A protein has these predicted regions:
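Well-ordered, non-membrane alpha-helical segments in soluble/globular domains
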Residues: 84-92, 124-137, 196-207, 231
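Surface-exposed cleft-lining segments at the edges of enzyme active sites
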Residues: 73-85, 115-128, 193-194
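A structural motif corresponding to the C-terminal end of an alpha-helix
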Residues: 98-103, 136-149, 203-220
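N-terminal phosphate/diphosphate-binding loop that engages ATP/GTP or pyrophosphate donors
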Residues: 1-75, 82
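NTP-dependent small-molecule kinase module
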Residues: 174-231
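Phosphate-binding/switch loop-helix module in NTP-utilizing enzymes
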Residues: 68-102
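Conserved phosphate-donor/acceptor-positioning beta-strand/loop module used by diverse small-molecule
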Residues: 107-110, 127-181
Length: 231
């Protein structure tokens, strides 16, 4: 699920540093230097630090200042091309491992949604680059014989406004800001709830374009009536 800190094919709560950045972090980490050295994973020239796991383990001992300093390098805050590199590498590792497993893995949102969120919503990247990102991952996992389930709604605006009413005011404000104050939304001068809906509609259109391009087993699930048990 989204938010799983042990996700086998994605990163959540993990930051990435080069050697210079990591050495600088260590020099400013005080008593936590040894903790960071024990928890860091070096992959090539990248130093990967699962900072949310560290926070969960150490709680208030892990200062907010240090947490915030590390989280600035979260993999989903890095430049688009660096994110693609790291996420594709993670999918490669997962594929190599999963080929030897006799298991079925069910993942939420990490295949298409995350790619479009960082590429389109956050950075407003060219459509071709975003499509290539998804297709790159699709190529990596093709030997796993994946199946894509795409959940859709007939009325996107109704669904979004329903979510805004059901979620906290903080969530509602945050999601509208995220979709309108950066990337695609900012470039197209969208603002407020109406603007966020325009961005969501554009994202859906690109998702459906990618869905049609993918050469894998795939099904659309219409969730307009919110009848999960009927699936």
């Amino acid at each position: 699920l989204e938010g799983n800190l042990n996700h086998p094919a994605d990163y959540d709560g993990v930051s990435c540093f080069n050697k210079f950045e990591f050495d600088r972090l260590l020099s400013n980490s005080g008593d936590f230097k040894e903790v960071l050295l024990k928890r860091v994973l070096k992959k090539g020239n990248n130093y990967l630090l699962p900072y949310r796991k560290i926070k969960n383990e150490f709680g208030d001992q892990f200062s907010d200042e240090l947490f915030n300093d590390i989280s600035k390098n979260d993999i989903y805050e890095l430049p688009f091309d660096k994110n693609v590199e790291l996420i594709a590498d993670k999918w490669n590792d997962f594929t190599e491992s999963a080929l030897d497993d006799n298991k079925v893995y069910i993942f939420e949102c990490c295949f298409i949604q995350n790619s479009l969120t960082i590429g389109m919503i956050k950075y407003g990247e060219q459509k071709e680059k975003i499509i290539n990102y998804v297709m790159k991952v699709a190529k990596i996992i093709e030997n796993l014989n994946p199946m894509l389930l795409y959940v859709e709604q007939d009325n996107l605006e109704f669904s979004f406004r329903k979510a805004l009413k059901e979620r906290t005011p903080e969530w509602s404000t945050g999601i509208v800001d995220y979709y309108t104050n950066q990337g695609y939304g900012k470039e197209h001068n969208h603002s407020g709830v109406e603007g966020a809906i325009k961005v969501l509609e554009a994202r859906r259109n690109l998702e459906l374009e990618i869905f049609d391009m993918l050469k894998m087993k795939k099904e659309k699930i219409n969730n307009t009536k919110y009848e999960i048990d009927s699936y």
